[in-house]
């Protein structure tokens, strides 16, 4: 190997190491912001929220018909939360909810949600949101072992009433579920 190949290899490795350092620095910064948002929402909530599950829908393209015919798609239940709007107008919430799952068994979930919020109309009461939720759930068919969740969130709302939703990805006959609920802010 000539010297230029050594220089090229060294340069490539050096640049990769610098990039990894930046990624870890950004991850530290992101985790700090995440933790601070949770603490601020817990300590300084602007609203108390009531959660009412509305619909569970199993994507028909991802299930055998005999399975979907047996599944519960009316998730009875409810929940409570704390929330706030930040200086950018984004929503932050802490919540706990329990509902009847696909097998009509109780499923609890608790976590933190964040949505970037847009107000596209002249009427500032109308809002759209897109974000994520991170939390813990437990299911009967997993013996109620706590399971971490990281899921997308989307919403449409007017004033203190919001229709919020997520999609649980999965494989054939497992997951691929749209879940939505009403959130009332007080």
Swiss-Prot record:
E.C. code: 2.3.1.251
Q: What does this protein do?
A: Transfers a palmitate residue from the sn-1 position of a phospholipid to the N-linked hydroxymyristate on the proximal unit of lipid A or its precursors.
Which is a Pfam family this sequence falls into? PagP
- List, in alphabetical order, the Gene Ontology terms for molecular function in this entry: O-palmitoyltransferase activity
Annotated signal peptide? 1-25
Question: Does Acyltransferase count among this protein's keywords?
Answer: yes
Q: Does the keyword Coiled coil apply?
A: no
Q: Which family does it belong to?
A: Belongs to the lipid A palmitoyltransferase family.
Q: Which InterPro entries match?
A: LipidA_acyl_PagP, OMP/PagP_b-brl
Q: What is this protein called?
A: Lipid A palmitoyltransferase PagP
- The active-site annotation reads 58, 101, 102
């Amino acid at each position: 190997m000539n010297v230029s190949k050594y220089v090229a290899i060294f340069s490539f490795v050096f640049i990769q190491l610098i990039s990894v350092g930046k990624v870890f620095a950004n991850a530290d910064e992101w985790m700090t912001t995440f933790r601070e948002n949770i603490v601020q929402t817990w300590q300084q909530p602007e609203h108390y929220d009531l959660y009412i599950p509305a619909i569970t829908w199993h994507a028909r393209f991802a299930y055998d018909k005999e399975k979907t015919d047996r599944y519960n798609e009316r998730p009875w239940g409810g929940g409570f939360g704390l929330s706030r709007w930040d200086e950018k107008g984004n929503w932050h919430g802490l919540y706990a909810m329990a509902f009847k799952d696909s097998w009509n068994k109780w499923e609890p979930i608790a976590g933190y949600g964040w949505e970037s919020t847009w107000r596209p109309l002249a009427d500032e009461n109308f809002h759209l949101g897109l974000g994520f939720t991170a939390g813990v759930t437990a299911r009967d068919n997993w013996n109620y072992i706590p399971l971490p969740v990281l899921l997308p969130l989307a919403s449409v709302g007017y004033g203190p009433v919001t229709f919020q939703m997520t999609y649980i990805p999965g494989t054939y006959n497992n997951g691929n579920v749209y879940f939505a609920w009403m959130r009332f802010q007080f």
